[in-house]
Structure formats: C-alpha cells, structure tokens
C-alpha cells in the first residue's frame, strides 16, 4: 500500500488526466468557428458521438477526484501536531505492539502444547492399530 503522499500524487495525476480528457472531448464535439477572411474547404461538420453525456461524466469524475484530493490532504499530518504529541503517539503504538507481541507468544505457546497433545494422541492411535494388527494375525508354528 502506498503512503498518503504517493496516493495524493497519484490522485492529482488522475485529476490532470480527467482535465485533459475533458478538453479533448470538448475539442472533438465543438462546432468549428469561422474566421473572417479564412475559408477552408472540406467537411466542417463535427463527428456525431455516442449518446453518452460526456459533460456529466467528466464533471462527475472531476468532482469525485477533487473530493478524494481533499480527503487525502486532510489525512496528512499537520504542523500543529507537536513533537510531544507525536512522541506520545509513538509510545502508545509501542505499548500496543508489545501487548500484541505478548498475546501472540501466548497463542503460539498454547498452539505448541496442543500440537504436542495431538501428536501424542496420534502416536497412541498408531501404536494401538499396530498392536491390534499384530494380535489378530495368525501365528505360525
């Protein structure tokens, strides 16, 4: 997962792409303007596009991307957060990390005990099967 700054860069780049694409669509869909003293021969009818409403599409994409940019900017740490607050947050995270490590060690210890019990039970079952096979086989004399 990318950090917040990289996400912000990617979202700004995406917004720039939306702007460029919307300008390209405007150029494709626009009616050519006539300039006095300049007559051009050839087809001057714009291409008919699909029925899709490009203006609505790009306005939705651009506004959604702008909201994402605002959200990412708000999630960045501010200068107002002092060194003391950052140190307290780090200490709290270290304590949570230590507690999680202790819980993990306890779970691993219990898992190892269960594994030993299961292995002992499987060994007993295998030995019982061998004993039953040995006792039920005919003895040669």
Curated annotation (Swiss-Prot):
Does the entry feature the keyword Zinc-finger, yes or no? no
What highest taxon heads this organism's lineage?
Eukaryota
Location relative to the cell:
Nucleus
Main localization (coarse): nucleus
What the entry lists under InterPro entries is as follows: Med7/Med21-like, Mediator_Med21
Keyword Phosphoprotein carried by entry: no
Gene Ontology CC: one annotated term: mediator complex
Q: What stretch or stretches form a coiled coil here?
A: 79-122
Per UniProt, what is one Pfam family of this protein?
A: Med21
Please provide the record's keywords in A-Z order.
Answer: Activator, Coiled coil, Nucleus, Transcription, Transcription regulation
- Gene Ontology biological-process entries: regulation of transcription by RNA polymerase II
A molecular function (GO) held by this record is:
transcription coregulator activity
| Family named by the database record | Belongs to the Mediator complex subunit 21 family.
Q: What does the UniProt function comment say about this protein?
A: Component of the Mediator complex, a coactivator involved in the regulated transcription of nearly all RNA polymerase II-dependent genes. Mediator functions as a bridge to convey information from gene-specific regulatory proteins to the basal RNA polymerase II transcription machinery. Mediator is recruited to promoters by direct interactions with regulatory proteins and serves as a scaffold for the assembly of a functional preinitiation complex with RNA polymerase II and the general transcription factors.
* Subunit relationships: Component of the Mediator complex.
Which protein, by its recorded name, is this?
A: Mediator of RNA polymerase II transcription subunit 21
């Amino acid at each position: 997962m990318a950090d917040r700054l990289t996400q912000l860069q990617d979202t700004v780049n995406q917004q720039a792409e939306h702007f460029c694409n919307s300008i390209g669509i405007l150029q494709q869909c626009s009616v050519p303007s006539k300039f006095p003293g300049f007559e051009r021969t050839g087809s001057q009818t714009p291409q008919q596009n699909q029925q899709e409403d490009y203006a609505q599409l790009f306005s939705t994409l651009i506004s959604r991307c702008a909201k994402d940019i605002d959200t990412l900017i708000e999630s960045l740490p501010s200068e107002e957060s002092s060194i003391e607050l950052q140190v307290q947050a780090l200490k709290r995270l270290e304590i949570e990390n230590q507690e999680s490590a202790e819980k993990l060690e306890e779970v691993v210890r219990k898992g190892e005990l269960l594994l030993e019990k299961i292995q002992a039970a499987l060994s007993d079952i295998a030995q019982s099967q061998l004993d039953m096979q040995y006792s039920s086989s005919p003895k040669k004399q």
